[in-house]
Amino acid sequence: MKTVVFAYHDMGCLGIEALLAAGYEISAIFTHTDNPGEKAFYGSVAHLAAERGIPVYAPDNVNHPLWVERIAQLSPEVIFSFYYRHLICDEILQLAPAGAFNLHGSLLPKYRGRAPLNWVLVNGETETGVTLHRMVKRADAGAIVAQLRVAIAPDDIAITLHHKLCHATRQLLEQTLPAIKHGNILEIAQRENEATCFGRRTPDDSFLEWHKPASVLHNMVRAVADPWPGAFSYVGNQKFTVWSSRVHPHASKAQPGSVISIAPLLIACGDGALEIVTGQAGDGITMQGSQLAQTLGLVQGSRLNSQPACTARRRTRVLILGVNGFIGNHLTERLLREDHYEVYGLDIGSDAISRFLNHPHFHFVEGDISIHSEWIEYHVKKCDVVLPLVAIATPIEYTRNPLRVFELDFEENLRIIRYCVKYRKRIIFPSTSEVYGMCSDKYFDEDHSNLIVGPVNKPRWIYSVSKQLLDRVIWAYGEKEGLQFTLFRPFNWMGPRLDNLNAARIGSSRAITQLILNLVEGSPIKLIDGGKQKRCFTDIRDGIEALYRIIENAGNRCDGEIINIGNPENEASIEELGEMLLASFEKHPLRHHFPPFAGFRVVESSSYYGKGYQDVEHRKPSIRNAHRCLDWEPKIDMQETIDETLDFFLRTVDLTDKPS
């Protein structure tokens, strides 16, 4: 049976050997070049392929059409993936009549994603395993073909558990590969409600936070012990690594991080104490705990810290350009609620952020991004995270002022992106659901949906393509120059402070604000082309919580990701939105101050937006990336959002001239 194999690591070598032993004909092997910054303790797939006389390749992007075509020419009957680190596109998976199968190092559906070996130890699990499953578009989500359980002993560390998983893999493949070859397998669908997903880990994720229980810190040490980079802490500015440890149920009133004793080297934790059995100071040699204490100059009562002393208390500096806007002011409120952020903001007005102007950790300058370029460059260099939220994002402006949309939304933001590249700063960039354009997918997917727009003579698309091109530029900078980025795509966020009624009076606002103005002034609610277009409306609080988690970036899971932020359950047409808003308006305690409802009026889009407008019939997000990267899902019902948004705007109206 002819196969093409994607493989890396020890598991890749085991998979190749098992396939050959089972009589498979391997036409080609795809692997990775070794990362010089990674300690290579595992077998080389490339060396094994060369020794066995099998063609081997390590392309940067195996999903490129040229590679898809070359793989198609090999006519594989079945495809296997053993610890290959990149997702394989559906075009390749569909090439094999018998299907494609992946080996994953956990008991799926638990611990989907990256580094399951380390994560199960971090989380103190007592059991894991290996799973062979059918490959589908979504990572690690296909039907299970075979599983083998592996017990995790209390003294297991990452390398011993790795060896156990290798042994289990050998057994699993010996039992299963002949059955696949003869088409005699039983597949069991994964239970999505039991699925968990974890992102990649980096060495920086393994710092020891002494306020946590000793058992949690011990599990961290086990999870990243040699040959992994190791768990670490600091004495002042001196970094040291803990290679092995023990938990002591030591009852102590000492502050977490305090040295309780030198021999053995015991450190007070949030619960219990951790004995450092072996460790290493800086880039030195490994030594036992009491010698490490001497090397570090520790005495009883010394304090350890999770970060270098000079930076331990510095707040994360967040630069928000467009801080007075809808997203900017709500995000500022969320960040200042915590005690570890310093917010720097620029905007042309300050009405929405006036409540923060006296906050000690909020720094605001009134200005225009097209003029204050030196201020912006200085603060990009100064800050840790940059959010360029300035954009023209109201549909009527796309046809009314297309060049201004391009100049602000594309040209000005490109300059900021290049500052982030220059100073190696993390950028969180607001893409838009508009980039999907007229995509026909039921759910718009960040990684697979096509981005489809209308012809050039429809200037309505200038906003969409400006944002899309910036998405592609940012992605390219990430791939080629190491820019740390996350793209987020809001789907019709709404809530208090979305535009204002004055903007709505000139047509320069989003849908709900325009509808509220119609109710306030007693003018007909205009339904563009009948108002049948469907959108998924998202409460600003849900959206901001997701954005806050992107900024937090737990485990660096958001790096290099595109994340839709929307509520697929809150789908409604513009007509339905208007009806819900009207019902809420009629029940509001301030209703008697406003004129009678003037009814709905159907108007053509060309008469409202002008020549060159096209609309989109539906726009529903897939939020699988938000689940995976943020552990987030929206919670707030659309009716609650409508009620609160309406209430906010009605209470901003001057009622002195209104009838009572």
From Swiss-Prot:
Protein name according to UniProt: Bifunctional polymyxin resistance protein ArnA
Matches recorded under HAMAP family: ArnA
Molecular-function GO term, any one: UDP-glucuronate dehydrogenase activity
InterPro entries the record matches: Arna-like_SDR_e (IPR045869), Bifun_polymyxin_resist_ArnA (IPR021168), Epimerase_deHydtase (IPR001509), Formyl_trans_C (IPR005793), Formyl_transf_N (IPR002376), Formyl_transf_N_sf (IPR036477), Formyl_transferase-like_C_sf (IPR011034), Lipid_A_modif_metabolic_enz (IPR050177)
Residue sites binding NAD(+) per the record: 347, 368-369
Positions bearing the site annotation: Transition state stabilizer: 102
Keyword terms, alphabetized: Antibiotic resistance, Lipid A biosynthesis, Lipid biosynthesis, Lipid metabolism, Lipopolysaccharide biosynthesis, Multifunctional enzyme, NAD, Oxidoreductase, Transferase
Pfam families hit by this protein: Epimerase, Formyl_trans_C, Formyl_trans_N
Quaternary structure annotation from Swiss-Prot or TrEMBL: Homohexamer, formed by a dimer of trimers.
Binding residues for UDP-alpha-D-glucuronate: 393, 398, 432-433, 460, 492, 526-535, 613
Reaction equation(s) it catalyzes: UDP-alpha-D-glucuronate + NAD(+) = UDP-beta-L-threo-pentopyranos-4-ulose + CO2 + NADH; UDP-4-amino-4-deoxy-beta-L-arabinose + (6R)-10-formyltetrahydrofolate = UDP-4-deoxy-4-formamido-beta-L-arabinose + (6S)-5,6,7,8-tetrahydrofolate + H(+)
Residue ranges of the region described as Formyltransferase ArnAFT: 1-304
Disulfide cysteine pairs (residue numbers): none
Keyword Oxidoreductase included in the entry's annotation: yes
Chain positions of site Raises pKa of active site His: 140
Organism this protein belongs to: Shigella boydii serotype 4 (strain Sb227)
Positions of region (Dehydrogenase ArnADH): 314-660
Protein function: Bifunctional enzyme that catalyzes the oxidative decarboxylation of UDP-glucuronic acid (UDP-GlcUA) to UDP-4-keto-arabinose (UDP-Ara4O) and the addition of a formyl group to UDP-4-amino-4-deoxy-L-arabinose (UDP-L-Ara4N) to form UDP-L-4-formamido-arabinose (UDP-L-Ara4FN). The modified arabinose is attached to lipid A and is required for resistance to polymyxin and cationic antimicrobial peptides.
